[in-house]
Amino acid sequence: MPHADLKYSNDLTLNASTILTSIEMVIQTHDPGSGNCKGRAYPTAEFHHTHLLVEISMLPKAHRDTAFMAALSADLETTIKAYLSQPCSFSLMISFSSENYITNRFEP
């Protein structure tokens, strides 16, 4: 279950929900067994320079090798930038969760 966080200056006009849905679709295209991508958006009114930082974390898997990550990064960058209409600094970071990370679903 990947996670995607959008951290951005609130002077950007963007539809965070649409971008998060698109991120999930790109990840699932590259890795159909990845599951749902949990997403959050954090616009901030206090910032220095207009920017968008996209942080994606995934569990390490054998098939998520260098070639996989390069293709995923390129497709994510292209997809996300298609939703931007203003100049801004853009950063994309894809990282792997540590072996101590626990993820599951809680049902009371």
Task: Name each model-derived stretch.
Residues 1-17:
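N-terminal presequence-like segments and adjacent domain-start helices
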Residues 101-108:
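Short, low-order "capping/linker" segments at domain edges
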Residues 75-101:
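C-terminal structural segments of small proteins and small subunits
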Residues 13-18, 63-68:
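Short, conserved charged micro-motifs
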Residues 19-30, 69-84:
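Short, non-transmembrane amphipathic alpha-helical segments
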Residues 1-5, 31-59, 94-95:
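Short edge beta-strands and adjacent turn/loop segments
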Residues 60-62, 80:
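Short amphipathic alpha-helical interaction patches enriched in hydrophobic/aromatic residues
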